[in-house]
């Protein structure tokens, strides 16, 4: 059979192309990935919402309900933490991958809260698919998270600033091979119960002050097992068939961001998963050649929640203005976000790891009132330029930032809908970022709504 007509033995008649090595490689659909390029809260939800309108499947690949995405549709503001925000597309399947950690009470509570807000989540249970290999966050993981933070505060005088959602402890259980997965929950419940009791006992011995109502938790988990069972699927096979079947738009919604990545972020002030592009493959069970466009989402300035190094932070009137105008409060914790100038050193580093094919520049309108705008272009230590983004936090805390000053535009851009309509200096700011990073900017955000995303190409 010719390649044009499909090859025997391949799913759905997938096409087999000979490679230079003579081996056969499958050609199928590719996933489009949206990732945060800074410390989170860049506006990924809005980019995902834009792309999700045409998507057949929208996936989450890592993290848990520590993430926070806000999406505004028909003047209704939906808040997502664990559910892929693409679930508001009635024609798409929302897929939670094996790299995600799931707190079941949080999942159902989030869905119910959003159901009360508008029509977006009607029928969500039929549109949600969960990998059977995803790990489960228990209430005692969350309680342990709080105790760990308290211990850090008492012992070191500072904590990590976690969301206390149990993310670190559950990923620790996963790495220690003592965690429980969705496949365990929906299979033999008596076997699940035994393993749950053993894990709870381990946590109780590590944290004697921890109170665990084992029987009460198991009863709740049995109820959740019945509700969630129809949603649980073998995620590897599900996505393999989607990738190698008829044409489909598959979107991956990254949570957290590059500088919060467990390996490449500002460790230890990071999250507990890989939120760079490698986490897409390991968190969904797909090969690298199935990854297509990788869109990085960048705020027109920089923000960070919690403690940790932040070279371009502005502890002054500028920082306060950005915080106030940008309504910079965490969706998950309600904490004030720290604010500062755009940092190109940080973005170049994020690009090295992720290979962004294009960027979305969010919240440009927040800069509308400034007469001049600074951009961090390089770092110095002891008066000498350093060519890289430092791994060591003590070093990163000591860097001096060299800034380029660009003229502001002092014009309201909230109602602008095309690039040509932007003030001249706003256009220059956008083009300057593109030129310095060597990455095209595909979207510019000038407001909260879906309509306020200007598409350039």
From Swiss-Prot:
Pathway: Purine metabolism; AMP biosynthesis via de novo pathway; AMP from IMP: step 1/2
Binding-site positions, IMP: 41-44, 66-69, 163, 177, 256, 271, 335
InterPro entries: Adenylosuccin_syn_GTP-bd (IPR018220), Adenylosuccin_syn_Lys_AS (IPR033128), Adenylosuccinate_synth_dom1 (IPR042109), Adenylosuccinate_synth_dom2 (IPR042110), Adenylosuccinate_synth_dom3 (IPR042111), Adenylosuccinate_synthetase (IPR001114), AdSS_2_vert (IPR027529), P-loop_NTPase (IPR027417)
Sites where the protein binds substrate: 41, 331-337
Main location: cytoplasm
Pfam family, one: Adenylsucc_synt
Residues given in the record as GTP binding sites: 40-46, 68-70, 337, 363-365, 445-448
Organism superkingdom: Eukaryota
Subunit structure: Homodimer.
Protein family: Belongs to the adenylosuccinate synthetase family.
Name of protein: Adenylosuccinate synthetase isozyme 2 B
Protein source organism: Xenopus tropicalis
């Amino acid at each position: 059979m010719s390649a044009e007509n499909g090859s025997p033995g391949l799913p759905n008649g997938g096409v087999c192309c000979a490679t230079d090595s003579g081996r056969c490689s499958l050609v199928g659909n590719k996933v489009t990935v949206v990732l945060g390029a800074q410390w989170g809260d860049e506006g990924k939800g809005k980019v995902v919402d834009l792309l999700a309108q045409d998507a057949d499947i929208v996936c989450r690949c890592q993290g848990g309900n520590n993430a926070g995405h806000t999406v505004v549709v028909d003047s209704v503001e939906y808040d997502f933490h664990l559910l892929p925000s693409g679930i508001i597309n009635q024609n798409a399947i929302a897929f939670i991958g094996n790299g995600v950690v799931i707190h079941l009470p949080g999942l159902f509570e989030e869905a119910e809260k959003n159901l009360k807000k508008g029509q977006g989540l009607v029928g969500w249970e039929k549109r949600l698919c969960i990998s059977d290999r995803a790990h489960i966050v228990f209430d005692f993981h969350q309680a342990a998270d709080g105790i760990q933070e308290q211990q850090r505060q008492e012992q070191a005088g500072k904590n990590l600033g976690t969301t206390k959602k149990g993310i670190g402890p559950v990923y620790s259980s996963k790495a220690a091979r003592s965690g429980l997965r969705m496949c365990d929950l929906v299979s033999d419940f008596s076997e699940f119960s035994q393993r749950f009791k053993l894990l709870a006992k381990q946590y109780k011995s590590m944290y004697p002050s921890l109170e665990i109502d084992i029987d009460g938790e198991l009863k709740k988990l049995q109820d959740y097992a019945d509700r969630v069972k129809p949603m649980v699927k073998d995620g590897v096979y599900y996505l393999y068939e989607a990738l190698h079947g008829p044409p489909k738009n598959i979107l991956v919604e990254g949570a957290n961001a590059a500088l919060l990545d467990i390996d490449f972020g500002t460790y230890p002030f990071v999250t507990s998963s890989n939120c760079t592009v490698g986490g897409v493959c390991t968190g969904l069970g797909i090969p690298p050649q199935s990854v297509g466009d990788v869109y990085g989402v960048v705020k027109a300035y920089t923000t960070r929640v919690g403690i940790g190094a932040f070279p371009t932070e502005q502890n002054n009137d500028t920082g306060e203005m950005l915080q106030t105008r940008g309504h910079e409060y965490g969706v998950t914790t309600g904490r004030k976000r720290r604010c500062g100038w755009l940092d190109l050193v940080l973005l170049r580093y994020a690009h090295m790891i992720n290979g962004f094919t294009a960027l979305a520049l969010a919240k440009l309108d927040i800069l509308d009132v400034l007469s001049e705008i600074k951009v961090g272009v390089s770092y110095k230590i002891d008066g000498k330029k350093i060519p890289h983004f430092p791994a060591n936090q003590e070093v990163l805390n000591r860097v001096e930032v060299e800034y380029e000053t660009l003229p502001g535009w002092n014009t309201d851009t909230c109602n602008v809908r095309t690039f040509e309509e932007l003030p001249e200096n706003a256009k220059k700011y956008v083009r300057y970022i593109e030129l310095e990073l060597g990455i095209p900017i595909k979207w510019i955000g000038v407001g909260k709504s879906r309509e306020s995303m200007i598409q350039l190409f």
